[in-house]
Amino acid sequence: MQAEGFDGPEALRAVEVDPGEPTPGRVRIAVRAAGVNPADAKLLRGMFGRGRVPVRPGSEVSGVVTAVGEGAEGPLGPILVGDEVVAFRVSGGYSAELVAPASAVLPKPAGLGWAAAAGLLLAGTTAEHLVEATRVSSGDTVLVHGASGAVGSLAVQLAVARGARVLGTTSERGEEVVRRFGAEPVRYGAGLEERVRVLAPGGVDVALDTAGIDEALDASVALVADRSRIATVAGFEHAARLGGILMLGGGPGADPGTALRDAARPGLLDRAGRGELEVVLGPSFPLTEAAAALALVESGRARGKTVLLP
């Protein structure tokens, strides 16, 4: 799937492109599933710059290695034809087959399905960045905004695993997911701060925003004494206005946390493969319906991770 310009997801078209043979240090992967992320839509709108066309979105996939270039070695060792793998921070993932740098490729655990594997690493490394940057530790009370979403549900699990008490904002339909991971659901909307104070009268130690809405950060500032323990991966403009809030990820003025996120990849895959982390899966779409998948993700109505299945 590709677009000839920066006119948004609606401009995506299915085309036949031969990925070719991998050059040294690269591998070819037959894609089994591709993660769909808001950043893909931003790329298609030129929000990361208007560089080379065609534009081929998709930064995370799972699949099977079909060819390897000379010296193709991933972070955990050599890569062989037939290996089941996960590739993250690639380009052109909305494909049936692609060539990727071996440095982006890690083994897929046998206990992890294709869709979950494709949806783990962007959300998981983002969640790891959130809990690490805010120093979540045993005994903390942590508020996670958007707790039933792809990033939020993983942040809940990681914080609970560190021994924190977790409160998670969600809609009515997301409450079961929040409870399943050991957190206490809080309905978002007007009066959020007051509802949190019913559960935590003295406020909370940490707030992690994956929702990107102003009320989440406003409530966080009211509930957390130390603003250096409030972090957002989505609400950058409002965070900048409020001041003192950690901005993490790919937004303007945000800390990308590249080294931390790269180091977290093997551990996240291992824990997910052993059933210690669960990727909450949302709807799946055929590759040719990538524009519809992106529309759902951008709407904020998707609960869990949306994936494409070539």
Name the predicted role of every residue range.
Residues D262-P310:
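C-terminal hydrophobic helical "lid"/dimerization subdomain
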Residues I79-L80, V136, V224:
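Short, well-ordered loop/turn sites that connect or cap secondary structure elements
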Residues D18-G35, R45-S91:
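Glycine-rich beta-strand-centered segment in the early N-terminal region that forms part
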Residues L121-G189:
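Mid-domain Rossmann-like dinucleotide-binding core that forms the NAD(H)/NADP(H) cofactor-binding site
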Residues A72, E84-G146:
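NAD(P)H dinucleotide-binding glycine-rich loop of Rossmann-like/cofactor-binding domains
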Residues L192-G202:
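Short amphipathic alpha-helix with an adjacent loop that forms part of the alpha/beta core around
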Residues A33, D83-E84, E97, T141, ...:
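Residue-level marker of beta-strand positions
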Residues I213-L277, P310:
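Glycine-rich phosphate-binding loop and adjacent beta-alpha segment
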